[in-house]
Amino acid sequence: MLIMGVDPGTAITGYGIVEYAGNRFALVECGCIRTMPGVPPAERLQALYGELVEIIKRHRPEHFAVEEIFFNKNTRTALTVGQARGVTVLAAAQSGLPVFEYTPLQVKQAVAGFGRAGKTQVQYMVKTILALPEVPAPDDVADALAVAICHAHHYTWERKLKLK
């Protein structure tokens, strides 16, 4: 199963594409999409959308996973991240991909085994699970890979439970 995980943001959006087969993970590609500061928000969102669609076309993932937004004390930040998240979901939906959403708690639980794990613990586990020489940088990339790993575990277990 080819999964694309995304950690949306207006300035930096992390993405990761992983192959999951036979209870093993393989990294296909990861990186980040950076938009230009000082550019009008609509243009930044349009650039993000275009880059995501190109990545989806290039790799043709079967599933698209994104983290749900948790309540943020900074309303302005929450709104801009929400806009970027909406654009990522739209890019996936218009590309015909099923979209799966996970809470930060679910992602941490699936990757680190503890829902209150710290960022460093999650990053270390992403590195370990994907057998990478170092933690992916920036943080947004590691977070996107964590979402993809989370989806692989959740989706696999849901399918197993339905077969019983």
UniProtKB/Swiss-Prot annotation:
EC numbers, comma separated: 3.1.21.10
A single Gene Ontology CC term: Holliday junction resolvase complex
Cofactor note as given: Binds 2 Mg(2+) ion per subunit.
SUPFAM superfamilies from the UniProt entry: Ribonuclease H-like (SSF53098)
Record PROSITE patterns: RUVC
Residues reported in the UniProt entry to bind Mg(2+) 2: E67
Requisite cofactors: Mg(2+)
Highest taxon of source: Bacteria
Main location per the UniProt record: cytoplasm
Catalytic activity: Endonucleolytic cleavage at a junction such as a reciprocal single-stranded crossover between two homologous DNA duplexes (Holliday junction)
UniProt keyword list: Cytoplasm, DNA damage, DNA recombination, DNA repair, DNA-binding, Endonuclease, Hydrolase, Magnesium, Metal-binding, Nuclease
Active site, renumbered: D7, E67, D140
Pfam family, one: RuvC
GO terms of molecular function: crossover junction DNA endonuclease activity; DNA binding; magnesium ion binding
Gene3D superfamilies for this protein: Ribonuclease H-like superfamily/Ribonuclease H
Subunit: Homodimer which binds Holliday junction (HJ) DNA. The HJ becomes 2-fold symmetrical on binding to RuvC with unstacked arms; it has a different conformation from HJ DNA in complex with RuvA. In the full resolvosome a probable DNA-RuvA(4)-RuvB(12)-RuvC(2) complex forms which resolves the HJ.
Family (UniProt): Belongs to the RuvC family.
Function: The RuvA-RuvB-RuvC complex processes Holliday junction (HJ) DNA during genetic recombination and DNA repair. Endonuclease that resolves HJ intermediates. Cleaves cruciform DNA by making single-stranded nicks across the HJ at symmetrical positions within the homologous arms, yielding a 5'-phosphate and a 3'-hydroxyl group; requires a central core of homology in the junction. The consensus cleavage sequence is 5'-(A/T)TT(C/G)-3'. Cleavage occurs on the 3'-side of the TT dinucleotide at the point of strand exchange.
Name this protein carries in UniProt: Crossover junction endodeoxyribonuclease RuvC
